[in-house]
């Protein structure tokens, strides 16, 4: 499926004329259509999802990290298809073209094409250069993305999660998409696994530029980041409000806080994992979760929603 993407990408790359923002938008839109079309073919050819429209819906949901599904029984899928379904989240989380930019060799043909492709593809209101070259910025972003995913995977393994489950869950967490490999999502796993997912969903909702600043020891800049502060404040306050609102539904404070924190982290980052049936929660908690879903997490993260940066502007 990547043949078309690479051809269209290098066609743009080797062009000698100036590359403007609108061309970047067209390349990104065309690439998303192409990869969605080819990405659904494994579902169709394997007969796991024989209907083309259903298969297209499923893979588009994966690449866009939406998380909606037409499947009634996820556990009936073969391991290979289950892996591809989860991997689509990981690819789509940071953006397929950002991935291609990160892999591409250096070169400066087609003035401005790298900058416009990265800005058109990256999540959030804007994307800033971490280093002078935009392609190097793309590589830094993806290295951070891969390292966080791997650390997430290791922590899941420490909780005695099966390797295959840990890989697929790490993909869904990193892309903040929420495709699970169990019908009950994360509810069937141990409290430790749920807590790990809570932490990493929150971490993937932070602007990736903050991680780079931490790596280069610009800690003060991270601490002064208004968007990050707002994200943490809303996250903590929401957990407290929901904890006290649903405290009578669970047997202990630990269980109450765990489910409240998990669902706030999941919904706020638009991941969509579930540790409990929150449809049974009081109206206040469900309304708060709905608001968190709309607001989303930080710009420059893999999360969806309006984004904290835009909320600050409003």
Model-inferred region functions:
Residues 1-314:
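Membrane-proximal intracellular helices of multi-pass ion channels
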């Amino acid at each position: 499926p990547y043949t078309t993407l690479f051809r269209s990408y290098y066609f743009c790359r080797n062009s000698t004329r100036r590359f403007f923002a609108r061309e970047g938008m067209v390349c990104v839109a065309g690439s998303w259509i192409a990869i969605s079309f080819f990405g659904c073919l494994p579902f169709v050819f394997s007969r796991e999802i024989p209907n083309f429209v259903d298969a297209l819906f499923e893979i588009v949901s994966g690449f866009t990290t939406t998380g909606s599904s037409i499947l009634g029984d996820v556990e009936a899928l073969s391991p290979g298809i289950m892996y591809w379904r989860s991997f689509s989240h990981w690819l789509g989380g940071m953006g397929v073209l950002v991935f291609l930019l990160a892999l591409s060799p250096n070169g400066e043909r087609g003035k401005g094409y790298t900058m416009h492709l990265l800005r058109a593809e990256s999540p959030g209101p804007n994307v800033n250069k971490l280093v002078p070259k935009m392609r190097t910025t793309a590589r830094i972003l993806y290295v951070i993305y891969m390292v966080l995913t791997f650390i997430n995977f290791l922590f899941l393994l420490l909780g005695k999660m099966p390797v295959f489950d840990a890989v697929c869950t790490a993909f869904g967490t990193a892309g903040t998409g929420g495709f699970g490999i169990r019908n009950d999502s994360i509810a069937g796993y141990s409290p430790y696994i749920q807590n790990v997912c809570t932490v990493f969903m929150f971490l993937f909702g932070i602007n990736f530029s903050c991680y780079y600043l931490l790596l280069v020891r610009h800690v003060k800049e991270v601490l002064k980041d208004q968007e990050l502060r707002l994200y943490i404040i809303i996250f903590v306050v929401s957990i407290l409000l929901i904890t006290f609102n649903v405290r009578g539904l669970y047997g202990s404070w630990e269980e109450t806080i765990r489910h409240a924190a998990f669902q706030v982290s999941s919904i706020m980052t638009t991941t969509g994992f579930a540790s409990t049936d929150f449809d049974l929660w009081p109206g206040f908690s469900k309304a708060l979760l709905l608001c968190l879903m709309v607001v989303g997490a930080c710009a420059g993260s893999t999360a969806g929603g309006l984004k904290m940066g835009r909320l600050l502007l409003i």
